[in-house]
Amino acid sequence: MVQSAPPITAQRNGVTPFITKLQAPLTKQPITTLQINLGRRCNLACTHCHVEAGPKRTEELSPEVCDQLIEIIRRFPQIKTVDLTGGAPEMNYGFRPLVEAARQAGKTVIVRSNLTIFFEPGFEDLPEYFAQHQLRVVASMPCYLEDNVDKQRGAGVYSSSIRALQKLNELGYGTDPALQLDLVYNPQVPRTEKFSLTPDQQQLQQDYKAYLEDHFGIVFNHLFTITNLPIGRVKQYLAAKSLYWPYVQFLEANHNGSTIGNLMCRDQLSIDYLGNIYDCDFNQMEHVPSKLPNGTALTVAHLLEAGSLDVLEEIQTRPYCYGCTAGSGSSCGGALV
């Protein structure tokens, strides 16, 4: 049973409740994407990780929940995309069964990879496996400069990531239309109150492409810019520096109402390794479950019993939702406007 955090209904520390800002409930649209968090196990422990994943984490998908998810993938043709994340999703139980079931059902499958997993014992075949099943690779690359990447993700991560990208290019990723390779930019966690919005996605993509091709011969399709939401390790760091509420206030001050129609929470379900369902991966990490109209927390078992994915009405919101609506907006697919 998920222990739900209490809803925030009144202004707190100068921050307007997100739902009050919208002046109307944030509602679900028909579900087209399942984002499945397979577990917390990861070979890295990045400072910006909202999942707080790492090598010592053991939580992962169970065979029972994996079977339920495969049934959902096969039963509902409205699902167009299955988005696999973690931790390092490749390290957690159920990764390959879910990939193969989803591809057999004709779904687009996204794997959110840290790239360095390719060089861990037992995972050396991953690049070829990705290509064989035509997985869309969304790879973490928080900067195109070595120093910044290694500061966020650990010494040597940049060089491993470069080798991994070159391997994917050799297999056709970034050039073959069936093998899409996208990179993800995360800004560094704020260290002072001199906050800034995520850089313009198109301009930064041009910078990434020019640098990586000129220096390493690497090509890729798209760059996604993602705002650091104040949850997980980012929240802990900001709170320790007394920057948590000032950062949330900054995000609210830059709220852009035109992002609302494109928010990823509207047409996706986020599912954890226990089979609990959330409106987004961020709510999952903050233990804010999706709720049926009667207040019951939604699970995968409920979906199978109901025979429908479209059982939710109102999306659960919290102050960190401003991270997805600030500036040009933010999502697992990058900027929104």
Positions of the model-derived regions?
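Short loop/turn motifs at secondary-structure junctions
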Residues: 45, 78, 133-134, 177-180, ...
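Radical SAM enzyme core and accessory elements
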Residues: 1-24, 240, 313-337
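Flexible mid-to-C-terminal extensions adjoining Fe-S/redox cofactors in radical SAM and related proteins
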Residues: 276-337
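Radical SAM enzyme [4Fe-4S]-AdoMet core and its adjacent flexible, acidic
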Residues: 138, 145-265
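Core AdoMet radical
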Residues: 33, 53-63, 78-92, 103-167, ...
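Conserved alpha-helical substructure of the radical SAM core
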Residues: 3-86, 90-101, 105
